[in-house]
């Protein structure tokens, strides 16, 4: 997917139906790859909450909206209609709003179909006798108000959702096991401004215990601010970090 040497050229049999867990911009990037380049039969994005809480940018969805299974999406809305109504969400209005974003769709040249499964929490990846993925075990959810937002609450109703592969596109925290100074979901950067442009401190890893920068370690893009902004913003951040490293 990301063309990483040593990994990007490995053969992976994705099968016909691929589930992507998550409904953010990373999900859209992966779906685009599966649809345009792998040409799988079906892609399903799995969401713990409902369509109102989807996180992808409407501009990003243009990359895959020409392959949306709109009939299947309407069926999915009918399935969860009562649970949306329970928190004051009108399924018909939400469906109209969501599908209205399917404009200026980019051609993919692929017969793939894409859909969504809402109010579903994956519990286990199920495999067959050959250790190949055969399904996701999922739990039905309902929505409950949480301040101005909503929270997914499990209904303890489990079911199997047949798929051939599962990809994960969730989480907005960096990996704290890397060993860099870590705090509140992000790696710590230098709080002491240097006055350069771009400012070195924004990209320098920093150890609060010693009060020193981590020599020779720089952070950029989502390693600096996890899941903030679109890919283009992360690229710009990488360009700035490259300037800082060159200066170093």
What are these regions (language model features)?
Residues 24, 49, 223:
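Residue-level signal for short, function-critical loop segments
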Residues 1-37, 188-206:
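Glycine-rich dinucleotide-binding loop and its adjacent helix/turn
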Residues 220-245:
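A conserved FAD-binding loop/helix module that cradles the flavin
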Residues 1-3, 37-38, 139-200:
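Glycine-rich beta-alpha-beta "Rossmann" dinucleotide-binding loop(s) and their flanking helix/strand
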Residues 17, 27-161, 178, 245-246:
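Dinucleotide-binding/catalytic capping subdomain of oxidoreductase cores
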Residues 202-229:
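Short FAD-binding loop at a beta-strand-to-alpha-helix junction that anchors the flavin cofactor
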């Amino acid at each position: 997917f990301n063309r990483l040497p040593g990994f990007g050229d490995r053969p992976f049999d994705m099968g016909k139906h691929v589930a992507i867990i998550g409904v953010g911009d990373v999900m859209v990037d992966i779906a685009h790859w599966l649809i345009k380049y792998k040409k799988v039969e079906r892609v399903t994005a799995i969401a713990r909450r409902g369509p109102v809480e989807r996180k992808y940018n409407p501009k990003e969805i243009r990359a895959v909206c020409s392959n949306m299974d709109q009939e299947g999406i309407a069926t999915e809305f009918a399935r969860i209609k009562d649970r949306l109504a329970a928190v004051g969400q009108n399924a018909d209005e939400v469906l109209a709003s969501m599908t209205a974003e399917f404009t200026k769709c980019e051609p993919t040249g692929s017969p793939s179909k894409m859909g969504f499964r809402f109010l579903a929490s994956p519990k286990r990846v199920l495999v067959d006798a050959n250790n190949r993925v055969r399904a996701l075990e999922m739990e039905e959810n309902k929505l409950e108000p949480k301040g101005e937002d909503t929270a997914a609450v499990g209904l303890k109703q489990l079911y199997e959702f047949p798929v051939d592969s599962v990809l994960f596109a969730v989480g907005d925290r960096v990996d704290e096991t890397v060993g860099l100074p870590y705090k509140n979901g992000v790696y710590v950067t230098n709080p002491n401004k240097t006055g350069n442009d771009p400012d070195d401190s924004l990209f320098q890893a920093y150890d609060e215990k010693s009060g020193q920068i981590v020599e020779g370690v720089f952070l950029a893009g989502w390693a600096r601010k996890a899941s903030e902004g679109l890919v283009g913003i992360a690229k710009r951040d990488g360009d700035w970090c490259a300037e800082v490293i060159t200066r170093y």
